[in-house]
């Protein structure tokens, strides 16, 4: 075969062109590629203005990297933050696992100027099930005229072609005026990792010098403690406990457990009750928790087709009124079987997230009628089990759902604690969470969080469980919930292999496990939550006192770059244990002592959870 230079030249040119194109593409991706249309923030239409009596306009801006901004004025409250929002479809493809950075600037204030403005940034699928790669809240600076730069690093949860995903800016956080400018979303592909972008964002946004004031004499709720959900039998497991659950029972202080009552397996036919498979696993769970002196909540997710109808795991199904008696009898038989055959009791019962419909959906009026019928049947069977009030999907809508139940005096004898899930903690208004505490005080009811977590869609993200981001955001959700709602009990979702705290084989704890352990040590049963405030909006502070005389603690969470704080209001000359958790290492302990004024200077590493514990 004879090969000449002339015959090779076309192939060489093709290879050279391909190399040049590949090099250019790599350089372009390493520098980042915008996934939004040009000026999309300024040309898109804000939807749902009528739902909050809102107005939107473009305003001129000086002294910033952008010359125009979107101003949105919200004049009314809405039940959901997406009632008024701007959605922007992406204009470039994105691959699962790509690292992206969103940047925008925000300024404004709530109506009356008493609080910062608030919005939420989301990157999500454009259609149901609205898979979310990120949902990040943002507050403006305290000065409504000051622009605040916000960086949101994240990784893509799925593959998307143009138009298949969108950026959503949610504005319905109560009456407020806010301005947003300089929006960009840059995709770095695989040239940078999400962790690298997270570190970069923290570096560009240092906390700096701060102060935190503790008022140990200003106390609130008394902590019942921390616990968890043990719901794998509800999802089909025939074993009561997996390796993750066993590890957590051994290494965490579990003060309460919530299990799933698998009604679909317990009563597959009307009048038939089977103590086998998933139902038996749940009954064995109750027995084991009773043996450990851990009180139990039993909640229902799914029901049998003959009772509830529809498809298995279908959302939003309403139990027909003519089936109330059948359902009540089935639940009663389960609780009696636990008592008489397993020697175990259930303190409280609920339907999981009945407001949202997972999977039973009840209006408050329907729930009141169900309880009105079930309460006497429980009592006739000799059961002391009471109903949780609410057990709602989120905290923002809890008060609207629970108040009618509390106002119905016919069911008052059958009601237990006010209960909600804090999945919306990082996006809900402070006022919405504070209203939960107010409702508890009004009706003299304890408040519990039956599912504690920060993102109900986290399972959609690529391997999020081992990340420090998961641990840090869990701490933020716990702090806000405890500080505002008056919750005395936090039940993590879950202490089994579902949103796991440790590896599946139960041998390797994840960072989030260490965070839970750190917080439960700082906020033990019997401690009273005490007031604490920080000089910087991003720094979170929570204090407690007791249960022993002279015992106190402070929880500090810094979600941005490194800084320092001076803790004020602590006992003078007190010996303290300082515990620091960051992405690279968790629960690193050292000793310190407050000065004669009760001050303590602390370094706060970037993206850290820090606890200070003082003992008599």
Where does each model-flagged region fall?
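Extracellular polysaccharide-targeting segments
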Residues: 29-42, 149-159, 172-210, 214, ...
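Extra-cytoplasmic beta-strand recognition segments
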Residues: 30-33, 37-42, 46, 70, ...
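Secreted extracellular polysaccharide-interacting domains
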Residues: 51, 72-101, 116-120, 125-138
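Short carbohydrate-recognition loop motifs
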Residues: 58-80
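Extracellular carbohydrate recognition and processing domains
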Residues: 128-162
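Substrate-binding cleft and catalytic face of glycoside hydrolase catalytic domains
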Residues: 214-217, 251-406
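Aromatic/acidic polysaccharide-binding cleft in carbohydrate-active enzymes
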Residues: 446-523, 527-538
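Carbohydrate-binding surface patches
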Residues: 534-574, 607
